[in-house]
């Protein structure tokens, strides 16, 4: 049995790659029922991790402030808007 990296420790890219592998395995349909359920649960956790990381990145981008010329000048607190 392999040791799986905890989903909460994965980068977005790693979680997305593993999610793609999980989906591929499930789509092939050659996995036993119990293994399919475990894969589905792992896939759901990976999907949530990717969504959370994307949301965090979007919030960072939204916090970038621009000057009159459209150049980045820094960031503003996320709750300032």
From Swiss-Prot:
Nuclease among keywords: yes
Alphabetical keyword list: Cytoplasm, Exonuclease, Hydrolase, Nuclease
GO BP terms, alphabetized: DNA catabolic process
Localization annotation: Cytoplasm
InterPro entries hit by this protein: Exonuc_VII_S, Exonuc_VII_ssu_sf
UniProt-listed Enzyme Commission number(s): 3.1.11.6
Gene Ontology CC: cytosol; exodeoxyribonuclease VII complex
Family: Belongs to the XseB family.
PANTHER family per record: EXODEOXYRIBONUCLEASE 7 SMALL SUBUNIT
Description of how the protein assembles with itself and partners: Heterooligomer composed of large and small subunits.
HAMAP family: Exonuc_7_S
The name this protein goes by in its record: Exodeoxyribonuclease 7 small subunit
Organism field: Ruegeria sp. (strain TM1040)
Lineage of the species this protein comes from: Bacteria, Pseudomonadati, Pseudomonadota, Alphaproteobacteria, Rhodobacterales
Gene name per UniProt: xseB
């Amino acid at each position: 049995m392999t040791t799986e990296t905890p989903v909460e420790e994965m980068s977005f890219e790693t979680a997305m790659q593993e999610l793609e592998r999980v989906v591929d395995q499930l789509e092939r349909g050659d996995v036993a029922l119990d293994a399919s359920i475990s894969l589905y649960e792992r896939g759901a956790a990976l999907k949530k991790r990717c969504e959370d990381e994307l949301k965090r990145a979007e919030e960072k981008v939204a916090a970038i402030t621009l000057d009159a010329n459209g150049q980045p000048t820094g960031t503003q607190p996320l709750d300032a808007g």
